Amino acid sequence: MLDKIIRIATRQSPLALWQAHYVQHLLQANHPGLQIELVPMVTRGDIILDTPLAKVGGKGLFVKELELALLDGRADIAVHSMKDVPIAFPEGLGLVTICEREDPRDAFVSSHYAHLDDLPAGSVVGTSSLRRQCQLRERRPDLIIRDLRGNVGTRLAKLDNGDYQAIILAVAGLKRLGLENRIRYAMSAEESLPAVGQGAVGIECRLDDDHTRQLLAPLNHRHTELRVCAERAMNIRLEGGCQVPIGSYAELEGDTLWLRALVGAPDGSQMIRGERRGPAAEAEQMGIELADELLSRGAREILAAVYLDNPAR
């Protein structure tokens, strides 16, 4: 079992490399002596930094090159932030493991202000996420929301240079990079509902690679898997992709799953929210039913307008 070297395809950003090393550590802790090699790659999402993601294909741009490496045999597994994983996979590939979730909340980051509510009218807030943008605009229509691309370090540098009065990042990413001190506060799910899968690390591989799948099996975290399953089922039913104004967050309370979701107009003028509670074993069905409810209440029209503006998703 341990003779073969496991090659991990990963992006080259500091956060992506952290995630790859994290999976390497988990694998070697479960399989002492296992040899692992990282295969760092540059994706289109890392190269195209001057255009909002929604305009150039969404977050799937961050995974396509990694998937090609799996398909042509250059790598055995690919490690992803779950919030970047598209709703569909190339034939022969699939998501086989979801590791234990880190804090899924959004972080308010600012050099001079402790809270979103403290920002003066006209302040510039940076985020490229349509999900974050619509919730910010609903809560604070007096703010100026501007796109913000690049890795975490680049985004923080732009904040420190005074380009923005505040930026919104993922708590999980900042914690993983040892940058917790930059978090002014973690935004509640009521204030900023997280993205589908936010805070979780997923592992993709060839579905016919039984050897690798056996090695990965102990890394799967069942509670996280159930939560993310519900969130992704909702997103798939909405045909949501990764770069659309959709939020979804599931929590486990014993054997009961509590799923919340929203679809919002990017300008914050319309927000459709819903929730479901039910047996955790029915996570996928709950996600589908909640999506159907949102669609029936106007989400279909909101998403159609978004896709018209951003045909590459």
UniProtKB/Swiss-Prot annotation:
Q: Which residues cross the membrane?
A: none
Recorded hits in InterPro entries, A to Z, give: HemC (IPR000860), Porphobilin_deaminase_cofac_BS (IPR022419), Porphobilin_deaminase_N (IPR022417), Porphobilinogen_deaminase_C (IPR022418), Porphobilinogen_deaminase_C_sf (IPR036803)
Put simply, this protein is called Porphobilinogen deaminase
Which superkingdom, per the lineage? Bacteria
First-level EC class? transferase
Biological-process GO terms, alphabetical: heme biosynthetic process; protoporphyrinogen IX biosynthetic process
Query: Which PANTHER family is this protein grouped with?
Result: PORPHOBILINOGEN DEAMINASE
Q: What else is known?
A: The porphobilinogen subunits are added to the dipyrromethane group.
The gene it comes from is hemC
Write out the pathway annotation from the protein's UniProt entry. Porphyrin-containing compound metabolism; protoporphyrin-IX biosynthesis; coproporphyrinogen-III from 5-aminolevulinate: step 2/4
* Cited function: Tetrapolymerization of the monopyrrole PBG into the hydroxymethylbilane pre-uroporphyrinogen in several discrete steps.
Q: Which UniProt keywords apply?
A: Porphyrin biosynthesis, Transferase
Q: Which GO terms describe its molecular function?
A: hydroxymethylbilane synthase activity
Q: What family name appears in the similarity comment?
A: Belongs to the HMBS family.
- One Pfam family recorded for the sequence: Porphobil_deamC
- Is ATP-binding given among the entry's keywords? no
Gene Ontology CC annotations of this record:
cytoplasm
Subunit description: Monomer.
Catalysed reactions, as listed in the record: 4 porphobilinogen + H2O = hydroxymethylbilane + 4 NH4(+)
Per the entry, the cofactor note is: Binds 1 dipyrromethane group covalently.
Residue list for modification S-(dipyrrolylmethanemethyl)cysteine: 242
> Is Transferase tagged as a keyword?
yes
The record's EC number reads 2.5.1.61
What is the required cofactor set for this protein? Answer: dipyrromethane
